[in-house]
Amino acid sequence: MVNAQQLELLIQNTLEPTHIEIQDMSGGCGQNFEVIIVSPLFEGKSTLARHRLVNHKLQEVIKDIHAFTQKCYSPAQWEALQAK
């Protein structure tokens, strides 16, 4: 079973995030996660390319999760969202 701390550590070690938010939507069961990842690695990439990058980097844990929802932003996009 995957927990939010393990997922956060893996994201920190593989995606160079400047901001991470992780919610376990399964009540602590580790089967349904929603994540927000802000990383300069996403700069200039389409949404599909960002998701593919995340899926590739996290493939070892995603295979054990029933549902994984991701929102991926570049630092500039995240700043713009926060300014609204």
From Swiss-Prot:
Pfam families: BolA
Protein name per UniProt: Uncharacterized bolA-like protein C8C9.11
Taxonomic placement: Eukaryota, Fungi, Dikarya, Ascomycota, Taphrinomycotina
Coiled-coil positions: none
Superkingdom of this protein's organism: Eukaryota
GO molecular function (one): 2 iron, 2 sulfur cluster binding
GO CC terms: cytoplasm; cytosol; nucleus
Family: Belongs to the BolA/IbaG family.
GO BP field: cellular response to iron ion starvation; intracellular iron ion homeostasis; positive regulation of transcription by RNA polymerase II; protein maturation
